Amino acid sequence: MPFKLKQALAGLVLSAVAMLPATALAQTVDEIIARGKLIVAVDTTTPPYGFLDADLKPTGFDIEVATKMGEALGVPVEFVTVTSPGRIPSLLTKQVDAVVSIFSITPARAIQVDYSIPYAGQSAVVIAPKSTAISGHADLVGKKVGLTRGTAEDGILTAAAEANPGIEILRFDDYASLLQAMVSGQIDAMGGGDYGEIYLKKSANGDDFEQKYKLKTFYFGIGVAKDNDDLRQWINTWLFTLKADGVLEALSMKYRNQPLPELPVF
């Protein structure tokens, strides 16, 4: 099934979830086990971290991490599909127990939610066709730059646009829409991760895409509700063992075809 159709179907799931009333969030590991399921927010429009397979089932790096978390708790995982802007609201409205969705750890987000220790990381970069000369923020002046709304690169490039008048920012609600805009020529450049299908495609003029310059390296944590220390501490312990046992490294090679970066701790 074409990826765009898969993404549209995922959007229907998101719409349905958005209409559901807030449920009673489990505050402890014991409560999750007693309830009999772990509820996790994921984004299925961000390959290789989250996407839909041929059977329309969520798969990817983040999906496997979330699945293994449920296995460690001895309960199945119920996935709630969100896009980047919906990650924090899914915790604030108590629809999910955790967010496993390339959720970069930032001080601004940590005001609203709590994070686990990092389990993965990637560089945010500016991407454009090879024929487009870009080496820094100043080269984006006069160009349309696409972003996924609510991502870490959104903040960086929005600040760059404020400091460099003439950069036009276009925001998209999911990675698939951003990707389509880049391929079709609706935008001149995009902010995104150093991964993904964009490098397998051609621009509207037949060019290959390439990374132009690095914005910053971000590290992903599992998000939980503020002050849910019982669950957060359990997740930290579990992630420690997952990394020590080589599971995270194996998942990185499976889905990203590259080893994990060195992960800081806090």
Where are these regions (language model features)?
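Extracytoplasmic small-molecule ligand-binding "clamshell" domains
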Residues: 26-102, 254
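Ligand-binding clefts/hinges and TM-proximal coupling segments of bilobed small-molecule sensing domains
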Residues: 28, 152-169, 208-211, 240-266
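Ligand-binding cleft/hinge of the Venus flytrap
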Residues: 52-54, 66-75, 153-171, 201-205, ...
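Extended ligand-binding regions for polar small-molecule ligands
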Residues: 63-72, 131, 138, 143-144, ...
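Acidic, polar ligand-binding/catalytic clefts
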Residues: 67, 71, 76-139, 208-209, ...
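Short beta-strand-to-loop elements that line the ligand-binding cleft
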Residues: 76-83, 147, 166-174
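A ligand-binding cleft/hinge motif common to bilobed small-molecule-binding domains
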Residues: 89, 102-111, 156-160, 181-216
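Periplasmic-binding protein-like
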Residues: 120-128, 198-240, 258-266
